[in-house]
Amino acid sequence: MRVLGVDCGSERTGWGVIDSDGGCHRMVAAGVIRTSPKCPFDRRLLEIGTALRGLIREHTPEFAAVEEVFHAVNAKTALKLAHVRGVALLTIAEAGVVFAEYSPLEVKMSVVGYGRAEKSQVQMMVQSLLRLPEVIASEDASDALAIAICHATHQATHEATSRRLG
């Protein structure tokens, strides 16, 4: 299965595409969609949606996974993040890609085995699980890959359970 993971942010939206059989994962591509804080917010949302649309067209994922909104200290930041997530989810849905949402705790549990893991621990496990020669430098791209791995693992478990139950 091919999975697109998205880690939303108003200035940096991480993305990562993996191929997976549920147990073995391979990175296809990863990166960051960057928008300027000097740009009007509506323009930044448009740039994020356009970039995601292009990534979906280029990599043709079967599934997409997006991290749920965490509880931010700053309400304005949380609201902006919610807008970015809305654009991401709409873009994914318009492309006909099945998507799922996972909390940061679920992603960390799935990838590291500990829901309160540090970012550096997540980065190291992403490197290990994808058999990469080095850690992904961008936390945003690494987080997006972790989200994709989380979904691939959940999807494989769901499919295996469905087969057993008939």
From Swiss-Prot:
Its main location: cytoplasm. It catalyses: Endonucleolytic cleavage at a junction such as a reciprocal single-stranded crossover between two homologous DNA duplexes (Holliday junction). Keywords: Cytoplasm, DNA damage, DNA recombination, DNA repair, DNA-binding, Endonuclease, Hydrolase, Magnesium, Metal-binding, Nuclease. Its cofactor is Mg(2+). It is found in: Cytoplasm. NCBIfam families: PRK00039.2-1, ruvC. Belongs to the RuvC family. This is Crossover junction endodeoxyribonuclease RuvC.
